[in-house]
């Protein structure tokens, strides 16, 4: 393939030539590449899809020539790229890729995805919408019989094979200390109750039994709370053939609609404890405004069924009977059978009621059918494995781990034995900075009267620290582990080349000479407390030494308020690598290496060993193949097993999936025991895994949000770096960040993703400190600020607008993200999914959680990407009869289990799904173009196991045999495969899809656009790309002048209008303050009329701007206005009089004056909206809190009209005592007549009454 490296100037000339149009004659779904097309390149050098693919993907919406782009927009983009050293940099241009795609199901991508989303959602969505709300009566007594028993009210119980309704609510209970297999289960349908009992509690001895639900043959919805746990106990789910059941999780629905972010959870739990304490003490405080500082506390709940049922349905679940299932004796279940079945049935009832409340809310939050269809796909993951290999993996990893523990402990014991030999050499150990910290006092040998050693003596003659390592007199070897407190002393660890010292009050510390104290303070180290300092002085004094330094605390990963109590955890590994933490002992080095190798298994072993592995040998009738025509039940498959991962499909507020083992599994590392976990997922004979990693998924989404402002890919600096940046040229985002910070490229990735997820400069400073502890606070702050000034930009606090970013490579992006986060109802740009109620702006006051809301906008869009991809794949699999099903998705990775004969077709389906998904993102953000270099996966992996790269050997301490490599194909290699064509489609699928109606859905950004004027869009964009604040101020003035001049021109007035004219009109009341988020700028003028849907000329993107209405504090103060007028000599006589007029109110009127309008009144009104009456009355009481008794007292005591004394020259002294004395001895004014007093009192009472009515 020809590769041309061209500069942007050449590209501008190329785009003005119309690309060669080629008549497409290839047979449908042929994979022959069409190389006759010319590259299509945009004005900033980004290559777009070839004309053939462009026409197939975007239809009539796409294909606009780049010469039609606004010259002004391109000038601004060019300026931004130049300022960041990207304009003119080389870009990669390749031959256009061209091959036929399956036709879209509609005229646009949105119509296409709506229809296939409905196709994949039905009939399940209809089942949910038609779900019963009235529950049938529960039976008075349950029968303990193996299998299913159906209970219909008014009829005798009957044994059935499985529930036969289309929707059931389901719950399973297990004797989890005996077996992972189910013990009993209950289900509820619209007509009956069902109970399933394991043969184990009905006279059998083997607990290995699964629950039949006929999920292979019947389309049905099975509802449960954390239903993945229940699904793992369903018999038919242990098949390679795809299930027809939708296991719908109410926990996921709750989290997506009402969940809490990680920053909210601690506050929420603290508030819950406070409420529980008030209930227990029977304290019921009055409602106050302070109780509503965080309204989100009242619109969310934790995720357990007990908390969710309490929050949504006011149901108090008693979970005490759950403890019976912790028994190791099945007779406990048998003896309490009726009680425990009713306990399970109560959970079913609560789950049903919770679903009735949550499901309609979820559909409003996530209205696009793809969101529901994607949830169905992620709810049926399976992980095939081989039973013997799985057991070998567990045994090998555990054995090596235990061996490593023994090795570590043996080396520690050897160190101890070497040290204890020094017990008779005090001159040596007392001078050693580590050994001198040990207690060397000895207990002498006790002798009887006969001179024989007394019995039951514990190591007489040995030092106390050594004796404490022997718990009893029978202990032969010291009992010690790597976590023992004494280990850092024995290993002779040092921090910053200073021996570590233990303090009860401050944890591990280190000594710093007095002359270097300020240096270490500047490095952000924290002094140990005074008690620790005093203890160290006493210790050194007792040793006959002089204390020559000050103790500083070894930093803790969680911050300076925590004490470091263990220096050998994973958090301190990088300090060893950087030489900050060292050891003087060679044996200690070996022990640390052994400890490091076992760290992964030590942390993950319980989660891995608890996996529920179901082998085919126990259920020979299951494990059916993907094809209904063939079977896997033969001698080669007796070793097969399946793990159903306990995935919560929407386990976070960003709707990401959560699972504690597989979704957090690390990649295989040569020095980590058990790190080859993912390779234990193995395809059965005749099958393979086909999958891909989405390249920089969330970074691309974020950059696309910024590029959409210019309506061109690569228009912003971050967009250009994301698409064309390279390590060799130093133009990719991570390399540029690494250059600024002076760190590695991998470390720079952490800073970049943290910043895009909403983290601030403080986060960067703390992270820098962790990577390089030798940096001072001032240095880290300076470097972090430099990074954020280059990326996020500088801040502008306008007199008319709120704060915004300008001048950085990511300023436009962050202004846009903050704009989304600041909306009343933030939505993801593509599928329009709404944010959880706990993060909606109306529920946030004291805490804004802005970083969490920005993070939500990006990560939730990443979930939209996954749902679109899954939905598209399911459609293509059905349409072209591919033998494939989803295996697992790990954030930006996706893997399908595919028959060997269909592996290349499945790979092509993935590439097609990706181009549709990327194009959908672009179109919904207003760009009907797609860059060629991100349209396809960089490679599709075809492998026998799951691993990060197909060419990884996955050699670890627990796996000495290299795994055969797989196959990785890019789009061109895939097109060269003759068997990669999708083949003949199933026409019935398209006929079903076409039956679904399309409802036009206004793109989210277009919906936001209606709030902004074209003038603002034009000027605000120009302000963001400026690097000089003076240019930003100039553009602000021009913006006001242009907007108002247009208004004057419409009225026939040709006078020019400036910013100062605007300010005067605001003061005179002729104009209201400019409202940036208003329908248009001219709303401030009386009788002004303008079209809300007016668009910018020449394809200017109609886009929401980034900030809300400026509040009163953002408008210049009166004195500032006056100064500006004086400077311009534009103060007229009317304003002079206004500024110098005298106040006509009396002192008492001024004393009790209350303003009941303006911003404060509006805020009070807004706070009272949708609030309880008690809260409204309390707010009103505080708002109108005029001390009436004080007013009456002042009137009756003739304080209503005393005159102000003329000002006198101040004395030299300003003593507060003298001032107080003057106030005490001031003369009273003469008394007024009683008639005046009564009249004033009546008028004041009338005014107060009127004010309250207002």
Curated annotation (Swiss-Prot):
Its EC number is 2.7.7.7. This is DNA polymerase gamma. Its cofactor is Mg(2+). It is an enzyme of class 2 (transferase). SMART domains: POLAc (SM00482). Residues 1208-1217 have a biased composition (Polar residues). The keyword Disulfide bond does not apply. In eukaryotes there are five DNA polymerases: alpha, beta, gamma, delta, and epsilon which are responsible for different reactions of DNA synthesis. The keyword Nucleotidyltransferase applies. Belongs to the DNA polymerase type-A family. Residues 1125-1145, 1202-1240 are annotated as: Disordered. InterPro entries: DNA-dir_DNA_pol_A_CS, DNA-dir_DNA_pol_A_mt, DNA-dir_DNA_pol_A_palm_dom, DNA/RNA_pol_sf, DNApol_Exo, POLG_palm_dom, RNaseH-like_sf. One of its GO terms (biological process) is mitochondrial DNA replication. GO terms for molecular function: 3'-5' exonuclease activity; DNA binding; DNA-directed DNA polymerase activity. Involved in the replication of mitochondrial DNA. Gene3D superfamilies: 3.30.420.390, 3.30.70.370, 5' to 3' exonuclease, C-terminal subdomain.
